[in-house]
Amino acid sequence: MENLDALVSQALEAVQSAEDINALEQIRVHYLGKKGELTQVMKTLGNLPAEERPQVGALINVAKERVTEVLNARKASFEQAELTARLAAECIDVTLPGRGQTSGGLHPITRTLERIEQFFTHIGYGIAEGPEVEDDYHNFEALNIPGHHPARSMHDTFYFNANMLLRTHTSPVQVRTMESQQPPIRIVCPGRVYRSDSDITHSPMFHQIEGLLVDRDINFADLKGTIEEFLRVFFEKELAVRFRPSYFPFTEPSAEVDMECVMCSGKGCRVCKQTGWLEVMGCGMVHPNVLRMSGIDPEEFQGFAFGMGVERLAMLRYGVNDLRLFFDNDLRFLAQFR
């Protein structure tokens, strides 16, 4: 048993001298493994007299349990030290100032479109869309625009060939809607349109939204009330509105809509060129020829239509003086609208 005590002391000393978990594992195998020192001592029980075996076996088991206990305690100590070191390395100081996330936002044109659509869908209009590459018939002919009209000129329209072009307005969507369904029709048609023009107030590509209502007993008073209410809601203020007689091939009578300048409240400024008025859209009663070519009887149904540039309304609402700013992708400008 003296050899057993010495063996246990040797094992405990080795455990205390171990520098890491790998060394502990080697010590465990050396003393407690299948061929370990204490395991070999246990195998010598067969050489002892039968009456001594229980006592000696119990002593060997106590020795093994003591070594195992010290091994496990030392291993737990190493694991705790390793965990503490890892936590210290990964420690987050919650008192440090945070790094803010830069959030995106809707483009001002998108915001303006959504605002317009929200008003008209609220009063019962649907949203209709159509192709940006149009044929001559739907872009011009079906809208009562004659062949000699200046809008058909290469200077104003982007042509692919003699019959196909980039649409110059969203009116073709109205035509396609009237061709595919019978009145009552209440739609707004938002989308990109293209014209050969580019300066501080014009872009070769811009956004337009047009509206169409076709039903029985529709008159100019209905159109006037709709537009006045839209402008009041869109700009969130009571504005003077006037309708000036004008000419559009697809409406008769036709009018240009002016509103009180939102910058100077009608007193006259640089934006309104000292007139106190701003032109915001065109409108009119749908021409009987347009209804007729779309398969609608103008004797039974009447309608009104209007169209406005989305960029124009966005410029007025947000006080932007250069149309091109909307398309420059300058985050310093766009971040103001988040």
Swiss-Prot record:
EC class name: ligase
Family to which the UniProt record says this protein belongs: Belongs to the class-II aminoacyl-tRNA synthetase family. Phe-tRNA synthetase alpha subunit type 1 subfamily.
Quaternary context: Tetramer of two alpha and two beta subunits.
GO biological process per UniProt: phenylalanyl-tRNA aminoacylation
NCBIfam families per the UniProt record, alphabetical: pheS (TIGR00468)
Organism for this UniProt entry: Pseudomonas savastanoi pv. phaseolicola (strain 1448A / Race 6)
UniProt-recorded Gene Ontology molecular function terms: ATP binding; magnesium ion binding; phenylalanine-tRNA ligase activity; tRNA binding
Protein name: Phenylalanine--tRNA ligase alpha subunit
Main location: cytoplasm
Pfam families: Phe_tRNA-synt_N, tRNA-synt_2d
Cofactor remark: Binds 2 magnesium ions per tetramer.
Cofactors that this protein relies on: Mg(2+)
Intrachain disulfide bonds: none
Subcellular location: Cytoplasm
Enzyme Commission number: 6.1.1.20
Keyword terms, alphabetized: Aminoacyl-tRNA synthetase, ATP-binding, Cytoplasm, Ligase, Magnesium, Metal-binding, Nucleotide-binding, Protein biosynthesis
Catalytic reaction(s) noted: tRNA(Phe) + L-phenylalanine + ATP = L-phenylalanyl-tRNA(Phe) + AMP + diphosphate + H(+)
One GO term describing the cellular component: cytoplasm
Binding site for Mg(2+): E252
